[in-house]
Amino acid sequence: SETAAEKFERQHMDSYSSSSSNSNYCNQMMKRREMTDGWCKPVNTFIHESLEDVQAVCSQKSVTCKNGQTNCHQSSTTMHITDCRETGSSKYPNCAYKASNLQKHIIIACEGNPYVPVHFDASV
């Protein structure tokens, strides 16, 4: 079965797309990355940077996660991300999303050895 690091990559990494933020992108990607299986995941962020650059955030500034854990890290530079949010009319199995194309710092949780991203916490 999938590791936490693999799940992070499936749910959040889209390195090679520059994603012009159209809702089609979110609708396709949420489906393709299996976040509409059994329910519609309400919010999800895709990161359009190299995996190497995102993994490097694990050695950048330590911050407290939303849940109070202390293994979150904030990127020193802004990153190109797409926020996908469920629309009001979205209803499983016809999950519908709108896209926001953003340039923000990401906050991710890291764990393990090697110390790698396992959870997307926020963007600021």
From Swiss-Prot:
Entry keyword Nuclease: yes
Cystine pairs: C26-C84, C40-C95, C58-C110, C65-C72
Composition skew (Basic and acidic residues), residue ranges: 1-13
Tissue specificity field: Pancreas.
Active site location: H12 (proton acceptor), H119 (proton donor)
One Pfam assignment: RnaseA
Reaction(s) catalysed by this chain's protein: an [RNA] containing cytidine + H2O = an [RNA]-3'-cytidine-3'-phosphate + a 5'-hydroxy-ribonucleotide-3'-[RNA]; an [RNA] containing uridine + H2O = an [RNA]-3'-uridine-3'-phosphate + a 5'-hydroxy-ribonucleotide-3'-[RNA]
One GO cellular component term: extracellular region
Residues where substrate binds: K7, R10, K41, P42, V43, N44, T45, K66, R85
Region of interest (Disordered), residue spans: 1-23
Gene Ontology biological process terms, A to Z: defense response to Gram-positive bacterium
Location in or out of the cell: Secreted
EC numbers, comma separated: 4.6.1.18
Source species, domain of life: Eukaryota
Subunit and interaction comment: Monomer. Interacts with and forms tight 1:1 complexes with RNH1. Dimerization of two such complexes may occur. Interaction with RNH1 inhibits this protein.
Role according to the record: Endonuclease that catalyzes the cleavage of RNA on the 3' side of pyrimidine nucleotides. Acts on single-stranded and double-stranded RNA.
Family: Belongs to the pancreatic ribonuclease family.
Protein name: Ribonuclease pancreatic
Organism: Camelus bactrianus
Gene: RNASE1
